[in-house]
Amino acid sequence: MKQHAYEVTLKHIADDQGNPSTYTDTLSFNSYNHDDIFKVLQVIQNSQMLDDEAAKSFAVGLKLFSEVMLEHKHLPLFKDFMPHFGQFMKALKQTVKTQSQS
């Protein structure tokens, strides 16, 4: 299957108390997805169901998680979760469609 390729970089900037991070390294890895994550983000942003920062976190997190789950759907953890995730995705698509039409 052809997939979009991404480089994901994560940098810790502050702890849960607002103090500057003590981590000096960034986490960087390559990830692949059957969807164009930027297009997914655009759809979520256009729906205005979340503020811009939340939309970015949600779109990226959702697509990274879902691709790993699909690639490892034979594992019991993911196999048991797949029907629930399918329901969630249907609800999300309906919500985005409804919000975009408003």
For the regions a protein language model found, what residue spans apply to each?
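N-terminal intrinsically disordered, cationic/polar leader segments
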Residues: M1-D52, P76, D80-S102
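Acidic, low-complexity intrinsically disordered segments
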Residues: D52-H84
